[in-house]
């Protein structure tokens, strides 16, 4: 996906500066004209990049979709070839939330749709904290009269 994205970005001068987050543990940064690739960003760098990007093109794995939902971002979803759960998730998010999708083959051919959709509105930390409190509260027992 990285090379296909880089080729697409370099052929689209209208996109301006672009950032690829490859998520590979070897670290480092690669510069190719207007395209920068981060190989091992911190959580803070990743959140800032997603929050401030004009366009997000990403895989449709569970953790990526959770990041998009928490940040309230739309994206073009590109399922990993041969990963049926990512294909199912991309189809579901396209139907349920209007997200744009394309296949790896379409990405490699430079046929990337405009991002679209309305991510689900979630407040996971508030919900999790409320549930945790409810599960861990010890009820006070009133003395029997």
Residue ranges and their predicted role:
Residues 56-57, 75:
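Short, well-ordered beta-strand core segments
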Residues 15-18, 56, 99-100, 118-121:
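A general structural signal for well-ordered secondary-structure junctions
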Residues 111-145:
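C-terminal amphipathic helix plus adjacent low-complexity
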Residues 4-7, 52, 92, 111, ...:
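Alpha-helical elements of Rossmann-like donor-binding domains used by nucleotide-donor carbohydrate transfer enzymes
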Residues 65, 69-120:
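Catalytic binding pocket for nucleotide-activated donors in carbohydrate/polymer assembly enzymes
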């Amino acid at each position: 996906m990285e090379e296909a994205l880089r080729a697409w970005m370099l052929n689209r001068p209208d996109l301006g500066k672009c950032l690829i987050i490859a998520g590979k543990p070897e670290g480092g940064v690669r510069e190719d004209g207007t395209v920068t690739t981060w190989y091992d960003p911190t959580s803070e760098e990743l959140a800032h990049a997603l929050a401030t990007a004009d366009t997000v093109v990403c895989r449709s794995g569970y953790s990526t979709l959770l990041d998009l939902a928490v940040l309230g971002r739309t994206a073009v979803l590109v399922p990993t070839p041969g990963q049926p759960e990512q294909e199912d998730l991309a189809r579901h998010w396209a139907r349920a939330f209007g997200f744009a999708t394309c296949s790896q083959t379409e990405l490699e051919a430079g046929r990337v749709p405009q991002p679209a959709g309305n991510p689900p509105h979630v407040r996971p930390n508030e919900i999790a904290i409320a549930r945790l409190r409810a599960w861990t509260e010890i009820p006070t027992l009133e003395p029997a009269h």
